[in-house]
């Protein structure tokens, strides 16, 4: 009964536990913060570990010859999301100044639009994409944090961060890939674990969210989420379709705001104190965008994937053959 319900919801294996975790963290956080294994598995403390294991298991399914496709697909998604977020934010900043427009500063816009939720992407690619789509997740992790936001706002001086961020993100998947290529039996054994971990990842991430942030972010936070999802997402989908020659479902899957993006305005304000007056408001708006896009994007991605085709739901035999060739 529970499984049938979860399968009816787009990315339900992750989204439903995520919402449950967010509800508990909002109203009764003390239930899961009792220490030991309970806190480790049912709070945000366990998120990175669960995601790391998930990526390791995914890595065991990859062959070295597939890495070119991974870099190409992931690179298009990463760059296009950065370009649209930076472009909107810079234009707003140049035209309207630091206060921005409609209550949204360029700090809030760039922080939200350039950062994507990798776990939502991975869950959606598990439902609609192929293993090359899934393997692009560590590459997309580069935009999860302040680095690209700082670049977009002209705050340099951290040239070693991109390389180290990439190394840290691809470590689990690289080790898994090496072991999987050495021993196919090991690959066959570990491959299913990626899907099994989805609800645990979802709950851990949800336990780091507070639903009251939607209220604190106000109408501007909701507007920011809509900009991230629909304006940013539409641009990424166009790049995915015309550069990568893909149907576009992966483009929608990265049209989110990362949970970690909530900390970005404070980091930027610390680097450039002129942004301090705007940091608190931007933080609440980015938090609202993170929650809203985590709900909207799975619904949109599911609709798009089924309407225009994806590896799990090809439109016709010709598209199915194309997906098999590209996988």
Residue ranges of predicted features:
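Transmembrane alpha-helices that form the ion-translocation and gating core
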Residues: 75-114, 222-274, 298-308
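Structural signature of hydrophobic alpha-helical transmembrane segments
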Residues: 38-54, 100-115, 159-174, 219-231, ...
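Hydrophobic alpha-helical transmembrane segments in multi-pass integral membrane proteins
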Residues: 22-26, 87-94, 149-158, 204-218, ...
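Entry/N-cap segments of selected transmembrane alpha helices
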Residues: 39-45, 62-93, 144-145, 209-240, ...
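Juxtamembrane helix-boundary/capping and inter-helix hinge elements in multi-pass membrane proteins
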Residues: 62-72, 95-104, 114-136, 142-143, ...
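Hydrophobic transmembrane alpha-helices of secondary-active transporters
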Residues: 18-30, 40-73, 173-183, 192-217, ...
């Amino acid at each position: 009964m529970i499984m049938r319900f979860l399968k009816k919801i787009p990315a339900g294996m992750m989204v439903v536990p995520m919402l449950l975790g967010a509800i508990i963290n909002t109203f009764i956080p003390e239930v899961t913060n009792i220490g030991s294994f309970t806190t480790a598995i049912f709070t945000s403390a366990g998120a990175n570990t669960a995601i790391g294991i998930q990526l390791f298991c995914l890595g065991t399914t990859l062959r070295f010859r597939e890495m070119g496709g991974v870099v190409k697909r992931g690179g298009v998604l990463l760059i296009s999301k950065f370009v649209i977020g930076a472009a909107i934010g810079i234009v707003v900043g140049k035209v309207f100044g630091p206060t921005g427009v409609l209550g949204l500063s360029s700090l809030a816009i760039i922080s939200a639009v350039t950062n994507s939720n990798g776990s939502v992407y991975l869950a959606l690619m598990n439902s609609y994409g192929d293993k090359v789509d899934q393997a692009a997740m560590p590459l997309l992790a580069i935009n999860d944090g302040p680095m690209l936001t700082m670049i977009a706002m002209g705050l340099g001086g951290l040239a070693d961060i991109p390389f180290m961020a990439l190394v840290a993100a691809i470590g689990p998947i690289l080790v898994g890939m090496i072991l999987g290529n050495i021993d196919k039996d090991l690959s066959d054994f570990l491959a299913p674990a990626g899907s099994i971990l989805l609800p645990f990842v979802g709950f851990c991430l949800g336990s780091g969210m507070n639903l009251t942030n939607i209220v604190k972010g106000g109408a501007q936070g909701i507007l920011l989420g809509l900009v991230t999802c629909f304006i940013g997402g539409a641009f990424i989908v166009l790049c995915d379709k015309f550069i990568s020659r893909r149907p576009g479902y992966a483009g929608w899957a990265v049209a989110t705001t990362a949970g970690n993006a909530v900390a970005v305005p404070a980091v930027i304000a610390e680097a450039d104190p002129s942004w301090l007056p705007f940091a608190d408001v931007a933080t609440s708006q980015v938090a609202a965008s993170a929650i809203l896009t985590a709900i909207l994007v799975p619904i949109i991605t599911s609709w798009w994937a089924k309407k225009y085709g994806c590896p799990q739901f090809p439109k016709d035999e010709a598209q199915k053959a194309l997906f098999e060739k590209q996988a």
